[in-house]
Curated annotation (Swiss-Prot):
It is an enzyme of class 3 (hydrolase). This is Ubiquitin carboxyl-terminal hydrolase 30. The chain crosses the membrane at residues 32-52. Residues 346-365 are annotated as: Disordered. It comes from the Eukaryota. It comes from Danio rerio (Zebrafish). One of its GO terms (cellular component) is cytosol. The keyword Glycoprotein does not apply.
């Protein structure tokens, strides 16, 4: 930019003032015309290309990215993973529609579910006219209403955010409904009709019926069963149920040089533990008053539940500092959870009779194997997740299987398919989250799953292959239950 001396500037101003009024008006009109032309050109550019910013249109066959608001890659990656779960989006739609029907609920009380649904719907849409980059700032504002604050430029964890979202949605769902007025006959009649449908009479049964609350929870909600058994008399305690939203799997100790699989992590999770110095009531009754060498016989029990261990690739050094584990764990696109399904005594007898009939008419060598194990048996000796939820969320490190094996899942009742993988690059103190997820399925397609995979890192999106997905070092795995029986696939 040229600079003028102070004397030169003053001289130009004096000459402009000495000119006549007509000359000055003409110059002002010329300047006005130039300014009007520039404004018209700017308006045309705005109409044709929109505002001058980073706003872009979504490419065909892609999904929108998410703007990083300052170390919010953990939130962006989790939202992309949730957007790849069709059953969760359907549940969220029903949940928000029920909230909108309740006139007593304010927008502030339902802000979290509405903000989350709008984001997930946009991230799973096929409309090519939508924005290429979205802003999840509204979800952060909704989370602050639930006493969860994210400081700027502070590292966070995607797994912790997942539990914050699920617990906040449950808190929003479990709020007490309004009390109907005595003269509100329409509401009272509806409540009576709904109660009559749930009324049933049972003369007896091994377990009490499960409350309907289990069926209304979000799709990630599941149950773990456990019980204790004495090693001496084999007396078993009643089955105990624990709820979960995700399974945090630890890496078992494997012989060096051998790969670690997701099935091994699951088996390690449910492996039995021996608890000593616990008195067995049944043995106490049988051995009442009996002494051996002047001492009461010590009875022992064993529990068949493995408590939740530290997952998240976390271990501790000799100095006591946390270290991220780098082992690769193989995971597959399809996962059969039949062997992890808890069966009651009656179900086990029916399953055994059907299995015996199948063995009598088939060669044992031709038995189908899923996940490397016999998938048609229910294991009733250990507590398992019941598999009755449409989506399961497995928290585990992982790497894919490089073996070209053919698995027959035609007999699998609880078959799940991989929908998203979250990967963490970095160490325990800093890093970056990215997501591998399936592209949204076609609206008129027969399958809810698309075969096209995408790599998403905040606002960057590109296509990826299944081999790249299965070769990644996973931090979070999302599996969706399949509803089509008789499926035979190749890994």
């Amino acid at each position: 930019m040229p600079w003028c001396k102070q004397g030169t500037t003053d001289k130009l101003v004096r000459e402009f003032l000495r000119t006549g009024a007509a000359a000055r008006n003409k110059m002002m009109k010329n300047w006005g015309v130039i300014g009007g032309i520039a404004a018209a050109m700017a308006a045309g550019v705005y109409v044709l290309w929109g505002p001058i910013s980073d706003r872009r249109k979504k490419r065909k066959g892609m999904v929108p990215g998410l703007l990083n608001l300052g170390n919010t890659c953990f939130m962006n990656s989790l939202l992309q993973g949730l957007a790849a779960c069709p059953s969760f989006i359907r549940w969220l739609e029903d949940f928000t529609s029920q909230n909108s029907a309740d006139r007593e609920r304010t927008e502030r009380e339902t802000q979290l579910s509405r903000s989350l649904m709008q984001l997930l719907k946009a991230l799973s849409s096929h409309d090519p006219g939508e924005d290429d980059v979205l802003d999840a700032g509204g979800l952060l504002e909704a989370l602050r209403l639930y006493r969860w604050h994210i400081s700027s430029f502070e590292e966070q964890d995607a797994h912790e955010l997942f539990h914050v979202l699920t617990s906040s949605l449950e808190e929003e769902q479990e709020r007490q409904p309004r009390v109907a007025h005595l003269f509100d006959m329409q509401t009272l009649e509806k409540s009576v009709e709904s109660k009559e449908k749930n009324i049933s009479c049972r003369s007896g049964g091994p377990l009490h019926p499960i409350p309907s609350l289990w069926r209304t929870r979000h799709p990630f909600h599941g149950r773990l069963t456990s019980y204790m058994a004495c090693k001496r008399c084999e007396q078993q305690s009643p089955v105990h149920y624990d709820s979960f939203d995700s399974l945090s799997l630890s890496i078992p100790s494997i012989q060096w040089g051998r790969p670690v699989t997701l099935d091994q992590c699951l088996q390690h999770f449910i492996s039995s533990e021996t608890i000593k110095e616990v008195e067995c009531e049944n043995c106490t009754k049988q051995q009442a008053g009996e002494l051996v060498n002047g001492e009461v016989l010590e009875s022992q029990r064993t529990t068949f539940v493995k408590q939740l261990k530290l997952g998240k690739r976390l271990t501790w050094s000799k100095e006591g500092s946390p270290i991220k584990r780098q082992e690769h764990v193989q995971f597959t696109e399809y996962l059969s959870l039949d062997r992890y399904k808890h069966c009651s005594a009656a179900q086990s007898q029916q399953k055994t009779s059907r299995t015996n009939k199948a063995k009598a008419s088939a060669d044992p060598k031709d038995k189908a194997i899923a996940n490397g194990v016999d998938s048609e048996h229910c294991n009733n000796n250990k507590p398992q997740s019941n598999g009755t939820f449409p989506s399961v969320f497995l928290h585990s490190p992982g790497l894919s299987s490089q073996l070209n094996l053919t698995y027959d899942y035609s007999t699998s009742e609880y078959l799940f398919r991989l929908t998203a993988v979250l990967v963490h690059h970095g160490d325990m103190h800093s890093g970056h989250f990215i997501t591998y997820r399936r592209c949204p399925a076609a609206p008129r397609g027969t399958s809810p799953f698309s075969s096209q995979w995408l790599w998403v890192s905040d606002d960057s999106v590109r296509k990826a292959s299944l081999q790249e997905v299965l070769s990644s070092s996973a931090y979070l795995l999302f599996y969706e239950r399949m509803q089509r029986p008789g499926l035979r696939v190749e890994e």
